[in-house]
């Protein structure tokens, strides 16, 4: 049975979002960013960045693979070294209208989504990291502190947890 995921729409960026569950990293769509779902038992790693609590997320740098990006961003934001990361799919972003929020991105792009449960936690030194705090939050309580946890992300997290 194929799992279906809710769709989303980013109002400011005028962009439709849908999650494509796959283990294949396609070269047919440009990946511009990544998201990491890093689990420790029944808890998910969150990082406190200027917009609020979030999962480790970041943009791909020139010449970098998305696997390199997700490891780098996780380390930069949390001080956690992700070892064996697993690609579980991507958020497919389709611009409805080009505007100031989305003009630096292609009309069709992707955000790679990864999971990890093999990692090393180092000391968290705020000046060395992009975030001000990090925590492992019970997966049933993410919405209590996450700055924006829509149904699409809840369903992706549940799907990711089932893949461990």
Task: Report residues per predicted region.
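Acidic, metal-coordinating catalytic segment for phosphate/diphosphate chemistry
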Residues: 1-35
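Short glycine-rich loop/turn motifs
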Residues: 33-35, 44, 131
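A structural signal for short, well-ordered beta-strand segments
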Residues: 36, 87, 114-116
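Conserved Nudix-box catalytic region and its N-terminal flanking loop in Nudix hydrolases
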Residues: 39-77
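A short coil-to-beta-strand element that immediately follows conserved catalytic motifs
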Residues: 81-91
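Active-site-adjacent beta-strand/loop module that shapes the phosphate/pyrophosphate-binding cleft
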Residues: 91-123
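NUDIX/MutT-family hydrolases
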Residues: 112-115, 124-156
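Charge-rich, low-complexity intrinsically disordered segments
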Residues: 155-164
């Amino acid at each position: 049975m194929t799992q279906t995921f809710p769709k989303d729409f980013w109002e400011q960026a005028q962009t439709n979002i849908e999650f494509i569950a796959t283990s294949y990293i396609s070269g047919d769509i440009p990946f511009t960013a990544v998201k990491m779902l890093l689990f420790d038992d029944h808890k998910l790693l969150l990082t406190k960045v200027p917009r609020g609590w979030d999962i480790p997320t970041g943009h791909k740098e020139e010449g970098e693979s998305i696997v390199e990006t997700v490891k780098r961003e996780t380390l930069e934001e949390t001080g956690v070294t992700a070892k064996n990361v697993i690609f579980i799919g991507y958020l497919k972003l389709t611009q409805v209208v080009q505007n100031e929020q989305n003009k630096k991105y292609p009309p069709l792009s992707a955000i790679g989504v990864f999971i990890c449960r093999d990692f090393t936690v180092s000391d968290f030194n705020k000046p060395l990291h992009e975030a001000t705090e990090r925590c492992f939050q019970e997966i049933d309580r993410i919405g209590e502190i996450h700055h924006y946890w829509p149904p699409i992300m809840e369903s992706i997290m549940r799907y990711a947890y089932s893949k461990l």
